[in-house]
């Protein structure tokens, strides 16, 4: 009876994935997709999304059917800034806590990219060996994803001005994310400090839990929302720069902005202090300090977001499996001899023979690793958060002939501003690479909303990319000296990193410029494979 109850609980948790009929030819779906992937690599045509496109065409229910196998469902991560790093954190933390996690590689944050990623993980028969999926989705593609798969968890980070040629005004982006909140069946985790995101609580369906992550009052001024940015920039010169993850905070004048109206919402995880690769989080009324490997103060807030959604998953796992363990303990206490187990004499099930418990769990169709995850402590979650390293291009450090080269992705005014504030130019050489391909956004007018005056003292060694001359003009208006300008990105990157050997380098780059920068560096140094995880 206990086994059947647990089995029923697990099947109910899988109901967040829309059910579809399996076509008779589904046995060939994975093989066909892998053949297309192989052919596209050999011919160097089609890109990484082509296998997903083909699979969507021949077997539209593949995505829904495959993710429907996951006992803990899907975590969907979306928002303007921080998706990749936060997805990496959530996936790494859940994995370190014992779960088997499927996640989409960096850059595959659209539906076909997820399908393509699945092709590398499933068996030829379509079996996905994982407990949970953690998926980064672009705001626009997330809308299409939730029509096929209703996520059990949604983590919505922020809404900033980003690629307005794609989305229009930021209210349009918020509307896109509202569809995600409305489709979530278990828990929606929202950024309390972003008014547009916090407002999405109203879109969560009945029965869906809403949790928030937030900031302590004295940190809120350092993480302005898009609506706060004009106010923040207007006082920045007088108040001083933002803190970095490398530099302890110092007091500065009070800023009151649009996020003040949401400050009273209860936060499940609150970032209360940051310092030199350190952060303190408050959960359940208790503070937890940890060292962090991530760079940039903004990534410490991403860590708060990741902790909030991991806590939500753990709470559900506890609700699913711990009552079963208690029931098992009661049966053992009633008749330990008949079950072949022992109690500790105090009515506790701590001494239950693990082999017997595992046998019952396997009979119920529950993975023992999920039971172990249900026992994860808050301190264990904090410890795993501190071990996550930067995602590629997001504070990633590549060593070239002994010189550290740090890649910093920038794609909108707020992200660029926070990066400039977090990574001080003194003692480093700076390069900026700007492209305007589709993945970057065609409209580069947002560069004029970034304050580059912090670079006046050191100047910029090199500017490159398709829009190098636009960037150079923008720097000239802020009276920032520029040594060289070239649209030949690969040559410029190599020249830049080889100059002034031993001097640390910072390269600020848009998305496609970052990919090309990594490719250029891979020819002269060891560059890790792109992906999510450690």
Predicted regions: what is each one?
Residues 1-48, 182, 208-209, 255-259, ...:
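ATP-dependent carboxylate-amine ligase
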Residues 8-9, 13-209, 249-255, 327-344:
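Phosphate-binding loop of NTP-binding sites
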Residues 87-92, 307, 472, 518:
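A generic structural signal for short, well-ordered alpha-helical segments in conserved domains
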Residues 90, 94, 114-118, 303-313, ...:
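Buried hydrophobic packing segments
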Residues 100-105, 290-297, 405:
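A short glycine/serine-rich beta->alpha loop
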Residues 135, 154-156, 190, 212, ...:
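Structural beta-sheet core signal
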Residues 139-141, 192-196, 215, 466-469, ...:
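Short, polar loop motifs at secondary-structure junctions
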Residues 156-399:
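Acidic, Mg2+-coordinating active-site environments of NTP-dependent enzymes
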